[in-house]
Design a protein with these regions (language model features):
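Sec-dependent N-terminal signal peptides of Gram-positive bacterial secreted proteins and lipoproteins
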Residues: 2-23
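Short, flexible loop/turn motifs enriched in small residues
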Residues: 6, 25-31, 225-229
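Active-site-adjacent loops and short helices of periplasmic peptidoglycan-processing enzymes
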Residues: 21-183, 193
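Structural motif marking the loop-to-transmembrane transition
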Residues: 3-4, 55, 101, 363, ...
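Domain-terminus/edge residues, biased toward the C-terminal soluble/receptor-binding domains
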Residues: 145, 158-161, 165-375
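Sterically constrained small-residue positions within well-ordered secondary structures
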Residues: 14, 24-26, 235, 328-329
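Hydrophobic alpha-helical segments, especially transmembrane helices
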Residues: 3-6, 61, 237
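Residues in and immediately flanking transmembrane alpha helices
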Residues: 15-18, 73, 195, 274
Length: 375
């Protein structure tokens, strides 16, 4: 009889085991979400990560990075009547006013001002439609494969969409920019106008995780009736950098509780292991542009792999995706990447950065080196 009881207990435990494993994964209200490791871009967990949804104000991450890469932060931006009349100008900007690019962008990101995004688009390209073309070109450049922008602020439009994975790609790219990181990690700020002189406004970041979640470093909220609750968040603990995105959470508050569950899951079940030093991954690349030369390309930092609980570091490998010959100028630029694989499947990548250029070698050595590499 005792043996029979033990047998049935064992059967019961085996039946419960799958549900116990599944229970470890985050249970969220959002229709779609993703968690990636920021350094490599490896997808660690997802729920409909490639599904299209309205990105709402997470769109403003693209508007911000385009401004930071193309406009002097001290340049003054004029507020047009169209910008001032845009739905939800939470900064309270008015037609005829002026703010520096830095102040306007900071205010836009912290309190999600839609009119500020329009003013930025007009300052850069004259109108929002032309600016949207710039946004889509940048999206393609950074690998956002299933995204289309039609405005700079994320107001609902049937043709304005993205996916959790694409938004995570955008956040990963943008968080490499020092000015962007400084903006999105601020809890409070005072925004000053250039004209009228003396006007200012104290603002509080709409990202409620700032100051309330260990290791949080950004990044952007979003909400419309059609988009539901949206949130992109980044956090760092013990050297592990995570980026997560939720789209179409049921309520504005649910997006924060959903995000906590996802980030908690990542920090509990993911760890970084050392792979290769940046010196080990150095790559000599030839430069041809009048005079010939070479550049040394390597990752900016030593390469580490993100592994889930139970994964074996010996299953990790790398491959290069970089040309052997490039045209100048390349100094200080990314010239390829190291592909990180697990069980021979690509799971992430790290950029190869051109650190220095050496000029002056013979055509003979060039031919021998290049053709020797090909052989």
């Amino acid at each position: 009889m005792r043996v029979i009881r033990l047998f049935f207990i064992l059967i019961l435990l085996m039946a419960l085991l799958p549900s116990v494993v599944r229970a470890e994964e985050p249970i969220i209200t959002a229709d779609a979400a993703i968690l990636i490791e920021a350094t490599t871009g490896r997808v660690l967990w997802e729920k409909e990560g490639e599904a299209r949804h309205y990105p709402a104000s997470m769109t403003k991450m693209m508007t911000t990075i385009l401004l930071l890469e193309n406009i002097d932060p001290a340049e003054e931006i004029f507020i047009s009547p169209q910008a001032a009349m845009t739905e939800n100008t939470s900064l309270g900007i008015k037609a005829g006013e002026r703010l520096t690019a830095k102040e306007l962008t900071t205010g836009m990101m912290m309190v999600s001002d839609n009119g500020a995004a329009v003013a930025i688009a007009e300052a850069m390209d004259g109108d929002t439609a032309t600016f949207a073309k710039r946004m889509n070109a940048k999206a393609k450049e950074i690998g956002m494969e299933n995204t289309n922008f039609v405005n700079p602020n994320g107001l609902t439009d049937p043709n304005h969409y993205s996916t959790p994975h694409d938004i995570a790609r955008l956040a990963r790219y943008a968080m490499e920019n020092d000015d962007f990181r400084q903006i999105v990690q601020r809890e409070k700020e005072t925004i000053y106008w250039s004209y009228p002189n003396g006007r200012f406004k104290n603002v509080i970041n709409t990202n409620e995780l700032l100051g309330n979640y260990e290791g949080i470093t950004g990044v952007k909220t979003g909400w419309t009736n059609a988009a539901g609750g949206c949130l992109t968040a980044s956090a760092k603990r013990n050297g592990l950098k995570l980026i997560a995105v939720v789209m179409h959470s049921k309520t504005e508050e649910d997006r924060f509780s959903d995000m906590r569950k996802i980030l908690d899951y990542g920090f509990q079940h993911v760890h970084m292991v050392h792979g290769f030093s940046k010196e080990e991954l150095s790559r000599r690349i030839f430069i041809v542009d009048g005079r010939m030369g070479t550049t040394v390309a390597r990752p900016i930092e030593d390469v580490e792999y993100p592994l889930m609980d139970g994964e074996d570091p010996s299953h990790c490998s790398i491959a290069y995706d970089a040309p052997r010959i490039v045209t100048a100028p390349v100094s200080g630029k990314d010239v390829g990447k190291v592909i990180i694989k697990y069980d021979d499947k690509p799971v992430g990548s790290v950029a190869l950065h051109s650190e220095r250029v050496e000029e002056g070698f013979s055509i003979g050595s060039f031919i021998v080196s290049v053709f020797g590499w090909m052989l």
